[in-house]
Amino acid sequence: VDEGALDEATGLYLSPLHCGGCDQVCPGGFGPHAAPSCAPSGKSAVCGMACDKGWVDVNNAGWDGCECKFLSEDDHPDGVDRNCDGVDGNAAKAIFVATTGSDAWPGTPTKPVKTVARGLQLATQINRRDVYVEGGSYLGDIQLAAGVQVYGGFSKGFAKRNAKTWETVILGV
């Protein structure tokens, strides 16, 4: 007996209690603000995780559920990831700098540049409002640019910002 579990549009069973067939229950055990889900995948159905409205799974780790409450489209570094992009601030509006970076890289969170000067140069060239700098010591002079903010004190990977925990020092030459 179908009992309403069959999705007419796809011809698949898409209920978390009947995912792909009768009594094929999607496992739970997710963290807060998350629940089991069932979705079409090609010609079959697969179990997954669905976030509660207003919550986002930033790190794709079900064990901690949907860990980020979406608060705003825009975000400035203030200790809270308000737009749930995985960065305290707005990743789409920033250039990233890390001691492990390379000035030949594009300045993204996974390919940061090495110097603050290069970060400022890129921000000006491609119209980014912020430069986010991981904690550490950076050599070289910098020239601030109009309309570009520089924020230090970021953790490795840029997920968190605390200027006391991840001190950032720029040593001019």
Residue ranges with predicted function:
Residues 1-101, 107-114, 118:
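Membrane-associated feature with strongest affinity for ZDHHC
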Residues 90, 124-125, 143-145, 162-164:
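Extracellular/periplasmic catalytic domains that process cell-envelope and extracellular macromolecules
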Residues 95-99, 114-139, 148-155:
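Glycine-rich repeat segments that build the extracellular carbohydrate-interaction surface of secreted
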Residues 102, 130, 171-173:
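Glycine-centered low-complexity coil/loop motifs and glycine-rich tracts
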Residues 139-142, 158-160:
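Short active-site-adjacent helix-start/loop capping segments
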Residues 148-173:
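Right-handed parallel beta-helix/beta-spiral solenoid domain characteristic of secreted/periplasmic
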